[in-house]
Design a protein with these regions (language model features):
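M14 metallocarboxypeptidase catalytic domain recognition
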Residues: 1-3, 9-408
Length: 408
């Protein structure tokens, strides 16, 4: 393999770029990581994109796109640095689907050693509520476009002074690790209550709402139709739920084109899924929030729709550093802290609404894999990484509640 190294600024470590020795024999859809400082070259790369997996806002910040393999020569001709993330995204999806079709007898004994669809996750959180009814209960907080329940598992909340907290995952359908991480966090909090003092203290002093699958229609569609589907299932093209909230709605990083992956919907809160979250937050007066996504290994705080610093920027930075540090301690995976807009502008996000309207301390966490060291997985993260990613997510949730209790 040919090897090239490119260092970028902004405090990000040098990135190592691996290239194919030669292109594939027939055109395929390939996910690549691009780094370019020149806006014209960046625009050229983006014009070739069939899909955008991660975006870059800082100068020189790498971004991941999907292109036809026969477009790579165009990038080379314009001296645009790129590296392969997933050599053939459709082959990766087929391999994953084949693995998931294994008979039940051949599946791992550990439920979190493999991915699960919406129905299986729904059954699992229902079992958690039945396992510990004195401290866990399951609630349908709304229904999706296609009528699927949006399940929220309530854990704790027995004390009058319990901190109302929300964690949610899978606003974007293809981000399977977010569904598994939120479910795994809930599982750990329920099952470890009697044996882990830190967990017991958390549950006793928190009213935690866990919504593992915000986008059940899109998530299920990604299992049976299009592994890389992002939006909900409104009409033919869907709506990006994380562009459908009212703060900054219609702003940068969202589109009025319904075919775009960041289509914001006809108006703010046009979708039943975002309405369900809004109503839950207002009803329960949620004070602390984490929106789990993938991928990138990032801890992000408001604002995303504007470069204007948040009123509580120093507080967000200090607490965000606590989260990143807690996550690092678990498996020595580094999560990078930044204001959301530094990554890329995005109007109408849940985290901005949680902070700007609900006045909650809200973070977005982009889970594994990272986007700095040439990782080659994208959204199809190997199942053996579910447990360690869950450990990192749980560490962040515990650290956030602790910081809130300390008045930070």
């Amino acid at each position: 393999m040919a090897l090239a190294a490119l260092a970028i600024g902004c405090g990000i470590a040098a990135i190592v770029y691996w290239r194919w020795p030669s292109p594939p024999s027939a055109p395929v859809r390939v996910a690549i990581r691009v780094a370019c400082d020149d806006p014209a070259r960046c625009a050229l790369a983006e014009s070739l994109a069939l899909d955008v997996w991660t975006e870059g806002g800082r100068p020189g910040l790498p971004f991941d796109i999907v292109v036809a393999s026969d477009s790579l020569a165009v990038l080379d001709a314009h001296h645009i640095a790129w590296t392969v993330v997933v050599p053939d995204i459709d082959a990766a999806a087929r391999d994953e689907a084949e693995r998931l079709r294994r008979p039940a007898a051949l599946r791992p004994a550990d439920w979190f050693a493999e991915y699960h669809d919406y129905n299986e996750i729904s059954d699992h959180v229902r079992q958690l509520a039945q396992l510990a009814p004195e401290r866990a209960s399951l609630h349908a907080i709304g229904a999706s476009v296609e009528g699927r329940p949006l399940w929220a598992l309530r854990i704790g909340g027995q004390r009058a002074d319990a901190t109302p907290m929300l964690i949610n995952g899978t606003q974007h359908a293809r981000e399977w690790i977010a569904a598994m991480t939120t479910t795994c966090i809930a599982d750990h909090l329920v099952r470890a209550y009697d044996t882990n003092a830190a967990i017991r203290d958390f549950v006793d002093h928190t009213e935690l709402w866990v919504v593992p699958v915000v986008n059940p229609d899109g998530y299920q569609y990604s299992w049976g139709n299009d592994r890389y589907w992002r939006k909900n299932r409104r009409g033919r093209h869907g709506v990006d739920l994380n562009r459908n909230f009212s703060i900054g709605w219609g702003g940068p990083g969202s589109s009025k084109n319904e075919r775009a992956e960041n289509y914001r919907g006809e108006y703010a809160f046009s979708e039943p899924e975002s309405i369900a979250l809004r109503d839950l937050v207002k009803r329960e007066q949620v004070a602390v929030h984490v929106d789990f996504h993938s991928y990138g290994q990032l801890v992000l705080y408001p604002w995303g729709y504007t470069s204007k610093p948040a009123e509580d920027r120093d507080r967000f930075a200090a607490v965000g550093d606590d989260l990143a540090s807690a996550m690092f301690v678990t498996h020595e995976r580094r999560y990078t802290l930044m204001q959301s807009v530094e990554l890329y502008p995005a109007g109408g996000t849940m985290a901005d609404w949680m902070y700007g309207e609900a006045r909650a301390q809200s973070f977005t966490i982009e889970l594994r894999p990272d986007r700095w060291s040439g990782g080659r997985q994208g959204f199809v993260l190997p199942p053996e990484q579910i447990r360690p990613t869950c450990d990192e997510g749980l560490a962040a949730v515990l650290a956030l509640r602790q910081a809130h209790d300390l008045g930070r």
